[in-house]
Amino acid sequence: MSKPDLLSLADLKKSQDAMIHKIDGSHAMKSRLASMGIISGSKITVDHSSPMGDPRAYNILDYVLSLRDEDAKNIFIELRN
């Protein structure tokens, strides 16, 4: 079985669906993201971007979550479409 091609969440485009694969960073950061529903196996899509492009809003677990690109770069995803 081959490893999936992973991208950072910051690279996800509006028309793409993805599954969260792994999260890097400190324990505190991982805990904070997990408390917001950012966990391995969750489906995530881009909802919209701010006028300057950062932060971006994502659809996850039936709600919209805003994340800075600085945080999104620590979240690795596998494209689903």
Model feature map: region roles:
Residues 1-81:
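Compact, glycine-rich, soluble single-domain proteins
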